Amino acid sequence: MKRLNRILFVLSVIGIAVYGLAPERYFKDMVFPLQESMILTAYDDRDDGGMSRANLSTTDADSSLLFSCTLHTGESPAWCGLLWSFAPDSLLHYRNWMLVDSLVFDVDVQGTTEFLIKLWTFDPDVTDPENKFSFRPLIKEVTVEKEGRQRIVVPISQLYVPDYWYESQKVDRSLELKHLEGAARLEISSGWNMKRGKSFSLKIYSIEAKGVSSFALGLLLFFFLAIATIAV
């Protein structure tokens, strides 16, 4: 028994050493600058009778993206935003963001204290590819504490599915998986409390989805489970 315990102790030390020396697997997927197969568009409410005005341009000097918008002052709903389509032509091009733990924005914000981000994912239990609203929306209100260029990190865990989606799409609320393996679109839009008639702008230098794989940790835990089983 003592010999077995010594062997298990040595194996435990070896397991910890291997875990410590194993390289971490970093994951990074760029949203901007654009990758092949991605399509970026700016939108506003003019096609639906509104008078909001969105503008999108690029800056040659630093390869940044400049988006600006002014919401109309009428009584009807107003909106504007940016939309990245990751797979405009094929389900095969959805981004697999299972390893993503945060979205990182390098952006210069002017004229607003909040903007919304919305990640649309393909839910095999719900989504009809012909109905863009049937994709699962994961949203987050991003608070901007100051104007100017800044690095904003949004943990993916803070994105949530709004109640109105379950109601409008008649989806069972027990279906809670985010389905990050099928990231289809990313959207940035004006905040809920954006003032009408006031212009705001986002100068985007980069957007990336980042994460670290827990594969090595999983192997270590499995290794210790095997040792515990042998010891018992």
Q: Language-model segments: which ranges?
A:
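Beta-rich carbohydrate-recognition modules and glycan-binding surfaces
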Residues: 1-232
